[in-house]
Regions:
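A signal for specific C-terminal beta-sheet/loop modules enriched in small/flexible residues
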Residues: 3, 24-29, 94-114, 150-160
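Conserved acidic, metal-coordinating active-site core of Asp-based
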Residues: 122-160
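Active-site phosphate-binding/coordination module
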Residues: 38-128
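Phenylalanine-focused residue identity feature
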Residues: 3, 17, 68, 138-140
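Acidic-enriched, low-complexity/disordered segments with a strong bias for Aspartate over Glutamate
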Residues: 6-8, 19, 31-32, 103, ...
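Active-site neighborhood of HAD-like aspartate-dependent phosphohydrolases
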Residues: 1-3, 7-56
Length: 160
């Protein structure tokens, strides 16, 4: 059986979602700062799944490869899917076949990156994070006003 799970806000949480510090353990540190936590129960259950030979745990996340490697409880697994599906890890290393496939797609679309950034910058006042290219695969940003973006998408879809 496969047990696939997202990471952020599913089995791991930032400090703003931690109500009781005694019920969690820090599982990610960046620049000497604790940034992510898991409940003791979640850690126990993940370890049970990892140690059960009939279940294969596969973490799936939007996190970059570097961000994923900081999350200790989900390391040393046969498979993981990171970078929004752009990287498939096998025993902690990117699968070369998938990497080659994704790279060929990204190279074909590379000339569109400027247009994508231009589009994102039209909504700069609604962004809380500067757009960034993750692992040379996809753009990531955060928005403050999702209604504006949803309206834009609705308008774009009706024009098609």
């Amino acid at each position: 059986m496969i047990f696939a799970t997202d990471l952020d806000r599913t089995i791991i949480h930032s400090s703003k979602f931690v109500d009781n510090a005694s019920q969690v353990k820090c599982i990610e540190i960046l620049d000497d700062k604790e940034i992510s936590y898991m409940s003791h129960l979640s850690i126990e259950l993940i370890n049970k799944i990892k140690n059960n030979p009939s279940i294969q745990l596969i973490p799936i996340t939007t996190r970059s490869y570097a961000q994923f490697k900081r999350v200790q409880p989900v390391q040393n697994l046969p498979y993981a899917v990171v970078a929004n599906g752009g990287i498939i890890l096998h025993n902690g290393e990117p699968l070369p076949e998938w990497e080659k496939h994704v790279d060929s797609i990204c190279r074909r679309l590379e000339d569109q990156y400027t247009n994508i950034l231009k589009l994102l910058n039209q909504y700069k006042t609604h962004l809380t994070k500067e757009p960034v290219l993750i692992d040379d695969i996809f753009f990531f940003t955060k928005i403050s006003d999702d209604k504006t973006i949803i309206n834009y998408i609705d308008e774009a879809m009706t024009r098609e």
